[in-house]
């Protein structure tokens, strides 16, 4: 099981560390979503909804860690170069907004 990041960070930092995160966790981020958005990784409550720490910080559901990993791994496999962390974050944001 990977890590959960209950401390506030940025969406860029979370995407950079995605491989180390608990795949059962969820990413929450402040809108509008950018690489610099405040974000954290937490377990979704069993009853659903937002974890208390995300509500207090004004964060919204962004994407589940497992879905983010699967999407980025598939996207990267089709590229002819290694994307930068910023490119990965930008692409994941587009996916979360338009396809997830």
Which role does the model predict for each range below?
Residues 39-100:
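Amphipathic protein-protein interaction modules
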Residues 2-47, 54:
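Extended, charge-biased low-complexity segments
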């Amino acid at each position: 099981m990977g890590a959960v990041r209950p401390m506030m960070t940025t969406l860029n930092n979370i995407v950079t560390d995605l491989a180390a995160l608990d795949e059962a966790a969820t990413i929450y981020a402040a809108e509008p979503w950018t690489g610099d958005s405040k974000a954290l990784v937490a377990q979704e409550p069993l009853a659903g909804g937002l974890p208390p720490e995300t509500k207090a910080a004004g964060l919204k559901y962004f994407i589940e860690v497992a879905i983010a990993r699967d999407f980025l791994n598939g996207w990267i496999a089709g590229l002819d170069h290694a994307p930068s962390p910023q490119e990965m974050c930008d692409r994941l944001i587009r996916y979360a907004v338009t396809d997830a």
